[in-house]
From Swiss-Prot:
Record protein name field: Energy-coupling factor transporter ATP-binding protein EcfA1
SMART domains membership: AAA
Compartments it resides in: Cell membrane
Gene name in the database record: ecfA1
Species in which this protein is naturally found: Lactobacillus gasseri (strain ATCC 33323 / DSM 20243 / BCRC 14619 / CIP 102991 / JCM 1131 / KCTC 3163 / NCIMB 11718 / NCTC 13722 / AM63)
Principal EC category: translocase
Length: 285
């Protein structure tokens, strides 16, 4: 098997069936994730998204098939390499309370480092650095249970950053936050991703979260319907509808303008750019 050197993740012919089900939860799915990019997997509830997250981390093992492949950072997932894979993948779940193990914020962030037997001076330096990156330095002595939902997710993200994984999976990690909290966390993660060249695989039923991804995967009933850039995915209205999803507001407006004969350049890919472009267009009339 030949791997693209820039792909941190390669998945081929991945299927998984739960023991109490006759129908596969994931059906012959193949995709790749380039290093240092943001890929978003979207699909309605029950489409198989979280199952894929657990398969990538070796929490679940795929159905037996000689053509099936999960390769992360050059390591092919098997029962023998399961722990090597888990060393390279960090997951932030939707409920951070389920991830907390430390009595204080700094203890919790240090937990993964302690398991890796990182020397204490280096550990303290890493903990301080990641807490600073997520804006939680002033809460290092706080007990996690007394933090707000957004603060808890910041601590969970810090704990993942501390161990330096090759791939960070966000499994519905903002679904329990209010819109303002969700916006702040996504803005923070995008900032960290660009500054640290992180590879992000976000999983969500909220298609609005996918607008700024480099790549979108559309999943429905365990099958991968499409894999493309946000611009090309959101141009295909029938694809979005067939997946039981709805277009982000920006693309609804953009598509309606295009259908009315107004040419919108491809680089106009945000609400701010669209408003600016329309104002410029109006001034020329």
């Amino acid at each position: 098997m030949i791997f693209m050197k820039d792909n941190i993740v390669t998945v081929e012919h991945l299927s998984f069936t739960y023991k109490d089900s006759e129908e596969p939860a994931v059906k012959d799915v193949s995709f790749s994730i380039p290093k240092g990019t943001w890929t978003t997997l979207v699909g309605h509830n029950g489409s198989g998204k979280s199952t894929i997250a657990r398969l990538l981390n070796g929490i679940l093992l795929p159905d037996d098939n000689p053509e099936t492949l999960i390769n992360i950072d050059g390591i092919t997932l098997t029962e023998k390499t399961m722990w090597d894979i888990r060393d390279r993948v960090g997951i932030v779940f939707q409920n951070p309370d389920n991830q907390f193990v430390g009595a204080t914020v700094e203890d919790d962030v240090a937990f993964g480092l302690e398991n890796r037997q990182v020397p204490r001076p280096k550990m303290k330096s890493i903990v301080q650095d990641v807490l600073n990156q997520v804006g939680m330095t002033n809460f290092q002595k706080s007990e996690p249970q007394y933090l707000s939902g957004g603060q808890k997710q910041r601590v969970a993200i810090a704990g993942i950053l501390a161990i330096g994984p090759k791939l960070i999976i966000l499994d519905e990690s903002t679904s329990m936050l209010d819109p303002a909290g969700k916006f702040k966390i996504l803005k923070l993660i995008r900032k960290l991703q660009k500054e640290n060249e992180l590879t992000i695989f976000s999983i969500t039923h909220d298609i609005n979260e996918a607008e700024h991804a480099d790549q979108i995967l559309v999943l429905d009933k365990g099958s991968l319907l499409a894999s493309d850039s946000p611009v090309d995915i959101f141009k295909d209205v029938s694809l979005i509808k067939n997946a039981g999803l709805d277009l982000p507001l920006f693309y609804k407006i953009k598509n309606k303008l295009i259908n009315k004969g107004i040419s919108i350049p491809q680089e106009v890919n945000t609400e701010e750019k669209l408003v600016k472009y329309l104002c410029q267009l109006n001034s020329k009339m």
